[in-house]
Structure formats: C-alpha cells, structure tokens
Design a protein with these regions (language model features):
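Hydrophobic anchor at the beta1->P-loop junction of P-loop NTPases
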Residues: 36
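The conserved Walker
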Residues: 40
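Hydrophobic positions on the alpha1 helix immediately C-terminal to the Walker A/P-loop
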Residues: 47
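A glycine- and Lys/Arg-enriched "phosphate-lid" helix/loop adjacent to the NTP-binding pocket
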Residues: 132-203
Length: 243
C-alpha cells in the first residue's frame, strides 16, 4: 500500500515490530520514529527499501515508511527552471538558508501528518534532527548561514520538535570516498558534490550521533550489499534484534 502526501512524495506501509526502548520524553500517543541517517550516497534509501520489503514479506501492517522528499525539493525551481538543489551546490552561501528551511518544512510536514495516521512505528529516511544537527549546523559553522538566519531556523525547530520526537537512530556509516563513488554512479540531477563536502558531512554526522542518548544501531555501509547477500541478511537480522 502506498500513500501520497504530496505530488511526488510516497509513503508506503508495512507491519508491527516489537517495541524498542522509548525515551521518557515520548508520549504513548505518538508513534515511535526510527530515523535512518547517514551521509549523502551512504545507501540509506537502499537499506530502507530492503527493510520495507523484509517486513512486507512478513505481512506486517503497522509500520509506515517515509522516503526523503527529494522530488519535492526538485520541484522548487527559479525563474530559469533551475532546481534549488542545483543552485545550492553551485552557490552554497546564497542558497543555504532557503534550502535548509525547505528541507525542514517538507520533512516536518510529512512526519506530522504521518504521526496522526495511527501507525505504531514510522521509519524515515533522515529526520528533522538530521537537518538541525548536521546540515544546518555545518552551514552555520562555515558562515554560509548567517547568525540571524540560524536563530530563525532554531526557533522553528524548537517549536515543532515535540510533535515528531525521534525514538531511535540507524546510522548507515560509509566512508566519504565510497559515498562519492556512489553519488557519481547514480548521477542525480543537481548532485555535483565535492569530496570535501562529504567529509564535512561525515564529521557532523559522527559528532551528532555520538552525542545522542537514544538507542542507536551503526551499520557498516562500505560493503556493496548487491554483491554480498549474506551481509544484507545479517543487517536485516541486526535491525530485528535492535528493534
């Protein structure tokens, strides 16, 4: 089953897993949100799809899977028809704040709507915490987001995070070099990403996730799972045990 929250962003369903440890801040009325995080090109989308298929084959129905809304971001274009992602990679300082606000708002909207649909678990490709603690912080530290812009961003974040608290993180950890190779192979429109940017993303992911106190599962994603089906099965078992 698939549900559409926007023209381009699909959310599909699967079924119940046993309950992970819930942070005290989470209320029983909210679903447990499990965020799959990792660098650009680390293989998050592939891992989420593998796990979705795994639980669908078990006939489960109370898990909601949310894709990262990249298609929605690519629908935002300037007067020349150039996407905001393309413009961002050409001129980060000029487009950093507007892209981060777009990423935050679109992801928040998906998670808030999903949280009201009665599912017990939500598995999402990245979360608003990723936007706040990795990309926006990195751009602010570099000076690509101004102090007042960052203050505005954090006010938005602090206002709504209570609606979509994260219950657990699955960190898809791949080296920046492997990520770059995968980014070049998939060749998405607008993804002209230098290695140095991926190294910075890797650093900020590590710092954020190392400091989190919620349950975490770290998966070595340097391995090509298409060539290693045994490793893919092992990851599925790790996730089952983690949950």
């Amino acid at each position: 089953m698939s549900l559409s929250f926007s023209e381009n962003t699909l959310i599909s369903t699967s079924q119940p897993m046993s309950q992970p440890t819930i942070p005290p801040s989470m209320t029983s009325s909210l679903p447990i949100i499990i965020s799959f995080d990792g660098n650009i090109g680390s293989g998050k989308s592939t891992k989420v799809k593998d796990i979705e298929k795994y639980y669908q084959e078990q006939g489960r129905t109370d898990i909601l899977f949310i894709q990262e809304p990249v298609d929605e971001w690519n629908s935002i274009v300037d007067e020349k028809g150039v996407t905001i992602l393309s413009n961002y990679y050409k001129d980060q300082k000029r487009f950093a704040f507007r892209l981060q606000m777009l990423a935050y708002i679109s992801r928040l909207a998906l998670l808030r709507r999903a949280s009201k649909m009665g599912y017990k678990y939500i598995i999402t490709e990245r979360c608003v915490g990723t936007d706040r603690n990795v990309f926006s912080k990195m751009l602010y530290d570099k000076g690509d987001i101004e102090h007042d812009e960052y203050t505005i961003y954090k006010k938005w974040y602090d206002e709504f995070i209570i609606d979509v608290p994260i219950g657990a993180i699955v960190y898809i950890k791949a080296s920046p070099e492997v990520c770059l190779e995968r980014v070049n192979i998939r060749a998405r429109e607008g993804e002209n990403i230098p290695l140095e940017y991926l190294k910075e993303c890797d650093k900020y992911h590590d710092e954020w996730i190392d400091g989190e106190t919620i349950p975490k599962l770290i998966i070595n994603a340097d391995i090509d799972l298409n060539k290693n089906p045994e490793e893919k099965l092992e990851i599925l078992k790790q996730f089952d045990t983690f949950i």
